[in-house]
Swiss-Prot record:
Gene name of this polypeptide: plcA
InterPro entries reported in the protein's UniProt record: PI-PLC_domain (IPR051057), PLC-like_Pdiesterase_TIM-brl (IPR017946), PLipase_C_PInositol-sp_X_dom (IPR000909)
Signal peptide (UniProt feature, chain positions): 1-22
Descriptive protein name: 1-phosphatidylinositol phosphodiesterase
SUPFAM superfamilies named among the record's database cross-references: PLC-like phosphodiesterases (SSF51695)
Protein's UniProt keywords contain Secreted: yes
Lineage: Bacteria, Bacillati, Bacillota, Bacilli, Bacillales
Amino acid sequence: MYKNYLQRTLVLLLCFILYFFTFPLGGKAYSLNNWNKPIKNSVTTKQWMSALPDTTNLAALSIPGTHDTMSYNGDITWTLTKPLAQTQTMSLYQQLEAGIRYIDIRAKDNLNIYHGPIFLNASLSGVLETITQFLKKNPKETIIMRLKDEQNSNDSFDYRIQPLINIYKDYFYTTPRTDTSNKIPTLKDVRGKILLLSENHTKKPLVINSRKFGMQFGAPNQVIQDDYNGPSVKTKFKEIVQTAYQASKADNKLFLNHISATSLTFTPRQYAAALNNKVEQFVLNLTSEKVRGLGILIMDFPEKQTIKNIIKNNKFN
């Protein structure tokens, strides 16, 4: 008991030290006027998918995303461990308006949202309400949502979320339960919809009333780079670049490329400061070379201009 108490005390002490000595995100400063200009003609970050052809496969896109999307607020534990717990500054709706189209949602059996053991002052019902309100206003967009069982429980997680998912069923991309093709949908298939990536104990897609909701997170039709546990910046950046190049050469798999990482001595904010601008410049270089389809780039603390430059890598009408 004393040992556990001592460990918790040391972690809290480290967090206080990091809180006072961690500097804000570095990098370039962008004016609001710069990032808020249309991407092309009248295309804005709120509706950027609307300017892409219906036939475009999701695997052929460059999609900005966020890691631990809801970790911009939380309870007292979140506040005390903020340097390690915080991964975002924008609210969910602000992220969607800024162009984020992949979100990382982690819930427990009580259907509240957590980052590990830390409650983020949010619920799954609130998340779904926010997403559907956005899709009502922007019906040609789609949101890819990883939904992780943060409790790693048994089948009860799927059982508990079914009534809530059923309320919003018209907003989810579904296929017949018997469909085993695992094909990546086109924009026409998913406009105005949520593509659910389920990460649960059963390791199977969510099924309600003989309809399959989205697909399993980590299924064979996906490639995931998520070296998050204390990599060097050099190693992490190399992995990001390699995964993006792989994505640009494949059109039958979703590439989930995490820019995020953390350790006890290097916080998510510090990794973001070291990596986000490097990744942005890399994307800009590939755009100028007409190398497209870089997959889903999943970030902590993304700047709005970084999000926009990832979007601009896509081939618009």
